């Protein structure tokens, strides 16, 4: 996993950049039988379904790590404007997408041309 900068903002103070392109990190998780039974019972009485919350948190982490890896493979230094999207594929599957814009920092050339 690559630890490059991922931010939800458009600008990174002190770091001008050029856009490389869009980048994604995706994962799909399925709920197991035990979670489904527990969720069904919790649905009857109300309240947070902690197993589902944990599954979504883990899915989010996987999606962001894949986003970082994909951005790094593109030669990016950072990802700006990162967002999440989630959705149900079926009653038993949940997808999480992390997406944003891969960017490369612009470094100033400090050499002088005396020609």
Swiss-Prot record:
One Pfam short name: YbjQ_1
Family (UniProt): Belongs to the UPF0145 family.
HAMAP family: UPF0145
Protein name: UPF0145 protein lp_2083
Species assigned in the record: Lactiplantibacillus plantarum (strain ATCC BAA-793 / NCIMB 8826 / WCFS1) (Lactobacillus plantarum)
